[in-house]
């Protein structure tokens, strides 16, 4: 969106309309900036540079997607480790029951 279009939208007191559906609630640029700031604060890399320069929206979204992918990979790895542990002959049925109860 061009800056002149954004300026006109702000002057009119309306938020940027959704192009996909007029029934969706529009969201203002300030709300987007606030949401991006909150999202950035959730990223572990952002903790180190907290208060430093704010990343672009694209950068924050890229980092978020990367972080979510890494979390999915970590869950997969932990699930595999847990499955191996439960299948191990060294784990007693009592220990396996405790592990299963913790997962539910």
Swiss-Prot record:
Inducing factors: By epibrassinolide.
UniProt feature coiled coil, ranges: none
InterPro entries: bHLH_dom, HLH_DNA-bd_sf, PRE
Annotated segments matching region Disordered: 1-27
Composition bias type Basic residues, residue spans: 1-11
GO biological process: regulation of DNA-templated transcription; regulation of growth; response to brassinosteroid; unidimensional cell growth
Residues covered by the bHLH domain: 16-71
GO molecular function: protein dimerization activity
Superkingdom classification of source: Eukaryota
Tissue specificity field: Expressed in leaf blades, leaf sheaths, lamina joint, stems and panicles. Expressed at low levels in roots.
Keyword tags: Growth regulation, Transcription, Transcription regulation
Compositionally biased region (Low complexity): 12-27
UniProt subunit comment: Interacts with IBH1.
Additional free-text comment from the UniProt record: Gain-of-function mutants ili1-D (T-DNA tagging) show increased lamina joint inclination and hypersensitivity to brassinosteroid.
Function statement: Atypical and probable non DNA-binding bHLH transcription factor that acts as a positive regulator of cell elongation and plant development. Binds the transcription repressor IBH1 and forms a heterodimer of antagonistic bHLH transcription factors that function downstream of BZR1 to mediate brassinosteroid regulation of cell elongation and lamina inclination.
Entry's family note: Belongs to the bHLH protein family.
Name of this protein: Transcription factor ILI1
Gene name of the record: BHLH154
